[in-house]
Swiss-Prot record, chain B:
GO terms for biological process: protein urmylation; tRNA thio-modification; tRNA wobble uridine modification. It comes from the Eukaryota. Keywords: Cytoplasm, Isopeptide bond, tRNA processing, Ubl conjugation pathway. Belongs to the URM1 family. This is Ubiquitin-related modifier 1 homolog 1. Coiled coil: none annotated. InterPro entries: Beta-grasp_dom_sf (IPR012675), Mopterin_synth/thiamin_S_b (IPR016155), Urm1 (IPR015221).
């Protein structure tokens, strides 16, 4: 290697060959996936926070005086969301009362550790924390459920219970809005999955920045256009305290092929993530298509398009020792579909293994 | 070559749950120290540090999409990715975005 090449390699490594695209003063530390701009740490903080602020303002997510719960898992997305929302609330005088809301699924060695992280966040950010547990709400922990039914399908229970638990926790806190840390990568992934499942009801909902305005408590996704890479880099540079490990009962959940596909696309052309979200937003459902009607569960009063909500059906199965009740393909509103559509095994398996967490919009 | 390697975002679980590793990397036979790149380092890490599920870390000869790499706190996308030259005392951080939380 000649000295010229050596010098070039050094300067390339140090990023000294160019300056931050935005301030033109400092060394860049990051290549932004959505714009491909090379920017410094300080400008990164500024554009990251400002873009989220613009999303909040342009979509009118909040009104002054509202009580807002942040769904807090202790993971990177909710931790960064709690931090950034606190900052913006102060800086721009949104006038919000912010709370942390955590769900304890009762998974030993996983949720107890991540909840310790949220308890530290409560102190670090000065946000009151409410924890709601499956044990309190349903009488069953995930540990209990897995003992009964094994690893297959347990994610279905957890996803259904968690979604409802968040609403119940939000009601306890008497909040006006619930925010979650779903990011652009999560939403693009969900668009793909709902297309592949042919789930048109969810497809029309999954790109909405606010959902459930006709339900108990509206949910907002301020990170809808925020890339996961930037959330991780922000947390790293700010040294935010978060917990990351996969759920011990769904060790293969992260292998969902849609997630891997999204990451492969991002590597080739990072803008693809925003493009997929845009495609999801632009889908039009024929007005003649029958959509499930929202009503309430006869048993617990939660919103449901059936007589009983999914959580009550699953709970009845558990309590009766018949855990397979409610598991399997829904039959539609009237339950009159006889045809069992065969899916390729690998696709169905991958979809099933991803039936938890961010999928449950 | 003395390096500090850090694994985060769940990747530490692949390395005996150790987040920070101070390692002494031998240069490949006869290699000039100026020729040691991230490509060599990844190969070394896969061989010497990854104890389980290497597919969570590597895909082909590079990190799996969704794993972020910082060299001295700088995105490796700015410094040439696999061709980034690594020097003595460098700090290399790997963070996964694939694990849930």
């Amino acid at each position: 290697m000649s000295s010229g090449e050596k010098m070039e390699a050094k300067s390339k490594k140090a990023g000294a060959s160019r300056l931050c695209f935005l301030c033109n003063l400092r060394r860049p530390v990051l290549k932004r996936p959505k714009t491909l701009q090379q920017i410094c740490r300080e400008c990164f903080y500024e554009v990251f926070e400002e873009e989220i602020h613009q999303v909040i303002v342009q979509n009118r997510l909040f009104k002054s005086g509202e009580r807002v719960a942040i769904g807090a898992s202790g993971g990177k997305d909710s931790t960064v969301l709690a931090y950034v929302l606190s900052e913006l609330n102060r800086r721009h005088n949104y006038g919000l009362d912010l709370f942390l809301l955590s769900i304890d699924e009762g998974i030993t060695g996983y949720r107890d550790d991540s909840l310790e992280t949220v308890k530290r966040n409560e102190v670090q950010y000065g946000l009151p924390l409410q924890i709601v547990s499956y044990k309190d709400l349903y009488g069953w922990t995930m540990d209990d459920i897995v003992k009964m039914i094994g690893l297959k399908n347990n994610c279905t229970f957890c996803g259904v219970f968690r979604r409802q638990a968040l609403d119940r926790g939000a009601t306890l806190l008497k909040v006006d809005k619930l925010v979650t840390g779903h990011n652009a990568d999560d939403i693009a992934e969900t668009v793909l999955l709902n297309i592949l499942r042919g789930d048109i009801a969810r497809l029309s909902r999954c790109t909405s920045i606010t959902t459930g305005e006709d339900g108990p408590i509206p949910r907002c996704k301020p990170f809808k256009y925020t890339y996961e890479k930037e959330i991780v880099m922000y947390a790293y540079f700010k040294k935010l305290d978060y917990f990351s490990t996969e759920c011990i009962y769904s060790p293969n959940a992260y292998r969902g092929f849609a997630r891997e596909f999204i990451k492969d696309l991002e590597r080739i052309r990072p803008r693809a993530i925003l493009d997929i979200i845009k495609s999801g937003e632009d889908f039009r459902i024929a007005t003649t298509t029958k959509m499930p009607e929202q009503g309430t569960c006869e048993r617990c009063g939660y919103i449901s398009s059936q007589k009983w909500c999914k959580a009550c059906v699953l709970l009845e199965g558990l309590n009766r020792g018949l855990p397979k009740m409610g598991i399997g393909r829904p039959r539609g509103v009237n339950g009159d579909h006889k045809m069992e559509i065969k899916k390729p095994g690998s696709v169905a398996k991958s979809i099933e293994s991803k039936q938890c967490g961010s999928l449950d919009f | 070559m003395q390096l500090t390697l850090e694994f985060g975002g769940g990747l530490e679980l692949l390395c005996d749950s150790e987040k920070i590793h101070k390692v002494n990397v031998d240069l490949p036979n006869g290699a000039d120290s100026d020729d040691f790149t991230m490509k060599h380092l990844l190969s070394w890490v896969r061989t010497n540090l990854i104890k389980e599920r290497p597919e969570m870390f590597m895909k082909g000869d590079t990190v799996r999409p969704g794993v972020l790499v910082l060299v001295n706190d700088c995105d490796w996308e700015l410094s040439g990715q696999l061709d980034t030259v690594i020097e003595d005392k460098d700090v290399v951080v790997f963070i996964s975005t694939l694990h849930g939380g």
